[in-house]
Every structure is written in C-alpha cells, then in structure tokens.
C-alpha cells in the first residue's frame, strides 16, 4: 500500500459531525500545487466554479463547463491527501432535472475522484439534493447569494438585510438540511440571519460573508492571498502576494534583457574528458 493511499481523507459524514464543534476550515483551490499547500491546514478544499473568474477571466461563473470542473477537480485530488475535496456543479449541469443532476454528479465523482459535490439553490433544489443523497452522492448546499443566478438577480448584493426578507432564506436553509445535504454554504447574508440559521438547522453552515457564528468559513484562495485586483467586502487579505509576484517578474525581465540571467551557476558546462 502506498503512503498516499494509507492516509485517510476526511469524509462528508465527518464534516457533518462537526456541527456545533470545531469550526470547519475551507478554501478554494484549482491546481495541484496550491491544493498541496491548502491541504496542510484545511478540512475541506472547494474546487469552486469561481475558477471561471480566477483562472479564465470570466465576469461571472455562468460560462464554466462540467469538463472544466472535472479537469481541475482531478488536479486538486492529485495535489491533496487529507482534505475532503468538494467540486462545484456548474450552471446548466443540474437544474433541468434530478436525473440530469445525478448524471453530472456521477461524472464529476467518477472522473475527478472527489468526495462530494456542491450545488446552488434551496427549496427549488431540495428534491434534487434528496435524489442525489439517496443515491450515494454527498451534497453540499449553497444558499443566500447564489452567483450562478446573477442574470436573474441583476447584481451581486447581500441578502436578508431587512428582516422582512428573512423567511425565504430560512426556508431554503431548512429545505437543504432536510433533503440530506451534509453541510451548506451561506453566502453574503446579513449576520443576524446567518447566526439564526446556524442555530436552527442540524447541518454545519459554512459562511462566506455571513457570520463568525457559522460552523465554518470559506474564502476564495486568490482573494485572501491578495492576488485578485478586487475582492468583496467580506474578504480579509491574509497576504499581499500580488506586488511580490509582479516585482519578481519585473526583475526576471530586466535580467533577461540585460543578459544578467542566466548566470554561470544556471548553465551547464562540458564534461571533463577522461
């Protein structure tokens, strides 16, 4: 047995059991190298459809395809060893029917070898979540601000900032939990509402722009590292890597143009004649 196969990955049931316990730490990753770094400190790695923004420069996540998600899911699985890897189901891969969702989820899990999928939606997607969960597909829900619905929402804005708007979001949370999801992401929801939902439902809540009272937190890796030119209000910059990377690229370009690089220590000499 290889060393890698001997290491036990975290599972969806283990994350489910963290409700009310130690906070679940989750970050995104789309590459084997960053996955290896994230894996050392995080319980869950999300291969998010935010890769459309971060990797491909799309304005929204709508253009992301199933094949794109599977490809990056494979990379993250190869780079990580212990974290539960969750892959987003992209827009158009699950909404038409629960059967379509199952077919897409099976492709993701079989071809990437990930441990769970994530899909957006509450009450309207509850039947689909139940259908998948009953057929061996662990599902992480996603409510509040749902980026795949940008063309319906019109803009990315926080949800539930007036108490009169709480009921539909609370209903979404209950529906996802009762349908069998093992956890749910709550995005850009007013803090008091996120806190209330966390207290009211039986599965872990993973906050992103929600509340410190949530059962866990998630951020986009590039946002928290300072690699994105802009980040939402809810992002804390834990690093400022952008300027350092730019400085390194500038130094490289300057040394190439001045022929300072490569130096003698970076090239190969001839073998000594015997």
From Swiss-Prot:
<dbReference type="GO" id="GO:0000287">
    <property type="term" value="F:magnesium ion binding"/>
</dbReference>
<comment type="function">
    <text>Catalyzes the reversible reaction in which hydroxymethyl group from 5,10-methylenetetrahydrofolate is transferred onto alpha-ketoisovalerate to form ketopantoate.</text>
</comment>
<feature type="binding site">
    <location>
        <position position="88"/>
    </location>
    <ligand>
        <name>3-methyl-2-oxobutanoate</name>
    </ligand>
</feature>
<dbReference type="InterPro" id="IPR040442">
    <property type="entry name" value="Pyrv_kinase-like_dom_sf"/>
</dbReference>
<dbReference type="GO" id="GO:0005737">
    <property type="term" value="C:cytoplasm"/>
</dbReference>
<dbReference type="GO" id="GO:0015940">
    <property type="term" value="P:pantothenate biosynthetic process"/>
</dbReference>
<feature type="binding site">
    <location>
        <position position="49"/>
    </location>
    <ligand>
        <name>Mg(2+)</name>
    </ligand>
</feature>
<comment type="similarity">
    <text>Belongs to the PanB family.</text>
</comment>
<keyword id="KW-0566">Pantothenate biosynthesis</keyword>
<keyword id="KW-0963">Cytoplasm</keyword>
<dbReference type="InterPro" id="IPR003700">
    <property type="entry name" value="Pantoate_hydroxy_MeTrfase"/>
</dbReference>
<feature type="binding site">
    <location>
        <position position="88"/>
    </location>
    <ligand>
        <name>Mg(2+)</name>
    </ligand>
</feature>
<feature type="binding site">
    <location>
        <position position="118"/>
    </location>
    <ligand>
        <name>3-methyl-2-oxobutanoate</name>
    </ligand>
</feature>
<keyword id="KW-0460">Magnesium</keyword>
<keyword id="KW-0808">Transferase</keyword>
<comment type="pathway">
    <text>Cofactor biosynthesis; (R)-pantothenate biosynthesis; (R)-pantoate from 3-methyl-2-oxobutanoate: step 1/2.</text>
</comment>
<dbReference type="GO" id="GO:0003864">
    <property type="term" value="F:3-methyl-2-oxobutanoate hydroxymethyltransferase activity"/>
</dbReference>
<feature type="binding site">
    <location>
        <position position="120"/>
    </location>
    <ligand>
        <name>Mg(2+)</name>
    </ligand>
</feature>
<feature type="binding site">
    <location>
        <begin position="49"/>
        <end position="50"/>
    </location>
    <ligand>
        <name>3-methyl-2-oxobutanoate</name>
    </ligand>
</feature>
<feature type="active site" description="Proton acceptor">
    <location>
        <position position="187"/>
    </location>
</feature>
<keyword id="KW-0479">Metal-binding</keyword>
<dbReference type="Pfam" id="PF02548">
    <property type="entry name" value="Pantoate_transf"/>
</dbReference>
<protein>
    <recommendedName>
        <fullName>3-methyl-2-oxobutanoate hydroxymethyltransferase</fullName>
        <ecNumber>2.1.2.11</ecNumber>
    </recommendedName>
</protein>
<dbReference type="InterPro" id="IPR015813">
    <property type="entry name" value="Pyrv/PenolPyrv_kinase-like_dom"/>
</dbReference>
<comment type="subunit">
    <text>Homodecamer; pentamer of dimers.</text>
</comment>
């Amino acid at each position: 047995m290889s060393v890698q196969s001997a290491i036990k990955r975290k599972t969806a049931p283990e994350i489910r059991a963290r409700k009310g316990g130690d906070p679940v730490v989750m970050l995104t990753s789309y590459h084997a190298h960053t996955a290896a770094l994230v894996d050392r400190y995080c319980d869950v790695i999300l291969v998010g459809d935010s890769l459309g923004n971060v990797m491909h420069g799309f304005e929204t996540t709508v253009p992301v395809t199933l094949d794109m998600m599977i490809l990056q899911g494979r990379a993250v699985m190869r780079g990580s060893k212990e974290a539960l890897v969750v892959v987003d189901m992209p827009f158009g891969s699950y909404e038409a029917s629960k059967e379509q969702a199952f077919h897409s989820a099976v492709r993701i899990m079989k071809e990437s070898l990930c441990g769970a999928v994530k899909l957006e939606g509450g009450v309207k997607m509850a039947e689909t979540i139940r259908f998948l969960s009953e057929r061996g597909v662990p599902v992480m829900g996603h409510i509040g601000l749902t980026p795949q619905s940008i063309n319906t929402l019109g803009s990315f804005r926080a949800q539930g900032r007036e108490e009169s708007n709480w009921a539909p979001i609370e209903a979404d949370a209950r529906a996802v939990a009762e349908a069998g999801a093992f956890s749910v992401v709550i995005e850009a929801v007013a803090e008091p509402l996120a806190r209330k939902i966390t207290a009211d439902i039986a599965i872990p809540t993973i906050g992103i722009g929600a509340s410190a009272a949530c059962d866990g937190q998630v951020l986009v890796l590039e946002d928290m590292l300072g690699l994105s030119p802009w980040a939402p209000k809810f992002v804390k910059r834990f690093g400022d890597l952008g300027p350092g990377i730019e400085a390194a690229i500038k130094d490289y370009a300057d040394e190439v143009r001045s022929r300072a690089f490569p130096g003698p220590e970076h090239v190969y000499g001839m073998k000594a004649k015997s």
